[in-house]
UniProtKB/Swiss-Prot annotation:
It is found in: Nucleus, Nucleoplasm; Cytoplasm; Nucleus membrane; Nucleus. Coiled coil: none annotated. The gene is e(y)2. This is Enhancer of yellow 2 transcription factor. It comes from Drosophila melanogaster (Fruit fly). Belongs to the ENY2 family. Ubiquitous. One of its GO terms (cellular component) is nuclear membrane. The lineage of its organism: Eukaryota, Metazoa, Ecdysozoa, Arthropoda, Hexapoda.
Length: 101
């Protein structure tokens, strides 16, 4: 299993993944990012969605790169620090002894 896969599995099992996700959602709401992305989606739909041929997939493809660049550096740094803390905890945990039956 890859390191990222192991971290992903660990965070799911310990509940840290949902904590990280909740932290991200609250920080993005606090800084106005969600409102900004919502407005961006509305504007794109008004420009391109008049004939109903613009799909959700197309909207996501257009908005995602722009939305990622709008995430404040402070939010990115805070999440990175949280993930590093989790990784440190993983490294510091003693390995469970194997059953030698």
């Amino acid at each position: 299993m890859s390191t990222s896969g192991a971290v992903d599995q660990y965070t799911v099992l310990t509940g840290d993944r949902s904590k990280i996700k909740d932290l991200l959602c609250s920080r993005l709401t606090e800084c106005g990012w969600r409102d900004e992305v919502r407005l961006m989606c509305r504007n794109i739909l008004m420009e391109k969605g008049t004939n109903n041929s613009f799909t959700v997939e197309q909207l996501i493809a257009e908005v995602t790169p722009k939305a990622r660049t709008l995430v404040p550096d402070a939010v990115k740094k805070e999440l990175l620090m949280k993930i590093r803390t989790i990784l440190t905890e993983i490294e510091e945990e003693p390995d469970e002894p194997e059953d030698e039956s």
